[in-house]
A protein has these predicted regions:
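Mature, function-bearing regions of proteins
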Residues: 1-186, 190-295
Length: 295
C-alpha cells in the first residue's frame, strides 16, 4: 500500500498552480503575474473578469480548511522564535542539508547551475520565507506569510514547467517538485526541525510539538500539497518521515555538489579581513560538525 502511495505521488504535481503558470504564457507578457499580485494583495474580488485559473487557485487558498486552529498557529510561532539562532543552525545544517540526500528531489536545484551563488540565494530566500510564515499572525490572509506561501507555490510551478520542457530531465526521477517531495519539505520544517533542536537540548511539550506540525500542515495546504499527504499530528508526521527515509534512494554527485556549496556559504560570507576569514573557518567547522552529528 505504501509503495503504491509513493508511486502515485511522485508523479503527481500541483495542478492549480500549474494552470496559473500556463495562463502566464497565454496572456501578454507580465499581465498574468500582475493579475496574480493584485488578487494576492487586494483580493480576487478586485479583478473585473479574473481568469478561471486564478479563480480556481484563490477559491482553494482563500478557503480555510475545517481543521485550521489559529490558536495552534500562534503557539507554533512562539515556539519557533524562542529557540533563537539555534533554529537557523538546524534549518540550514540539518533540514536543508538533509534534503540533498534525496538525489531525485535535489535535481531541480542542481539544474540551476552556479551552485555557490545559488546556495547563498537559497539561504536568503528560505530564511525570509520561514520568518514570514512563523511571524505571529503571518498566516492571516493579508499578511506576508500567507502571500509568501502562495508565491513559493507559483515559483515551484514555473520551475516545474521549465524542467519538464528540458530534454535533460529524466522521467525516472519522477515529476520535478512533485507532491511526495513537497510533503518531505514540509517535514523538514516541522518534525525534522524539532528533532534537530531536541538534539541540542531544547525541550518541547507535546502541545508545542503538535502546534508546530499544525502550522506546517497549513503552510503545506497553501502551497498546494495534497491534503492526504499532510500530517495531521506529530505521530502522522513521524510515520511520514519514516516512509520518506525508507524510499529516499541513494544520493549522487549532484547531492554532493549541492551539499558542498551549502557548506561553503559560511566561508563566502565571512569577509576579506584576516579575522573575518578565521571566524568564517570556525563557523564552517561548527556547522560541518553539527551536520555530521545529526546526519
Amino acid at each position: 500500500e505504501d509503495v503504491a502511495r509513493l508511486a502515485e505521488f511522485i508523479t503527481r504535481i500541483r495542478p492549480l498552480a500549474d494552470a496559473v503558470v500556463a495562463m502566464y504564457h497565454r496572456l501578454p507578457a507580465g499581465q498574468g503575474r500582475k493579475l496574480l499580485d493584485q488578487a494576492l494583495e487586494q483580493g480576487l474580488h478586485t479583478l473585473d473578469d479574473p481568469p478561471e485559473e486564478l479563480t480556481a487557485l484563490f477559491h482553494q487558498v482563500d478557503h480555510e480548511p475545517i481543521w485550521l486552529d489559529r490558536a495552534q498557529l500562534r503557539l507554533a510561532c512562539e515556539v519557533s522564535h524562542r529557540v533563537g539562532l539555534a533554529g537557523e543552525l538546524v534549518l540550514r545544517n540539518l533540514s536543508l542539508m538533509g534534503g540533498y540526500l534525496a538525489a531525485a528531489a535535489a535535481k531541480p536545484l542542481a539544474f540551476t547551475g552556479e551552485l555557490d551563488r545559488m546556495a547563498n540565494r537559497r539561504l536568503v530566500e528560505t530564511g525570509k520565507f520561514w520568518i514570514d510564515v512563523t511571524t505571529p499572525g503571518g498566516l492571516e490572509r493579508d499578511r506576508d506569510g500567507f502571500k509568501s506561501a502562495v508565491r513559493v507555490r507559483l515559483m515551484h510551478a514555473q520551475v516545474r514547467a521549465m524542467l519538464l520542457k528540458s530534454d535533460k530531465w529524466d522521467p525516472a526521477w519522477g515529476h520535478p517538485l512533485n507532491q511526495w517531495d513537497s510533503m518531505a519539505t514540509i517535514l523538514e520544517f516541522s518534525v525534522i526541525f524539532l528533532s534537530g533542536l531536541r538534539s541540542l537540548g531544547f525541550l518541547f511539550s507535546k502541545r508545542e510539538r503538535e502546534a508546530v506540525v499544525h502550522l506546517w500542515r497549513y503552510v503545506g495546504y497553501l502551497m498546494g500539497v495534497d491534503e492526504r499527504l499532510l500530517p495531521a499530528c506529530e505521530a502522522d508526521a513521524m510515520r511520514a518521515l519514516y516512509q520518506v527515509i525508507a524510499t529516499i534512494g541513494e544520493s549522487d554527485e549532484d547531492s554532493r555538489r549541492l551539499g558542498e556549496a551549502l557548506a561553503r556559504a559560511s566561508l563566502q560570507d565571512s569577509g576579506d579581513g584576516w579575522l573575518a576569514k578565521r571566524l568564517g573557518k570556525v563557523e564552517y567547522t561548527l556547522r560541518a560538525g553539527y551536520t555530521r552529528y545529526v546526519l
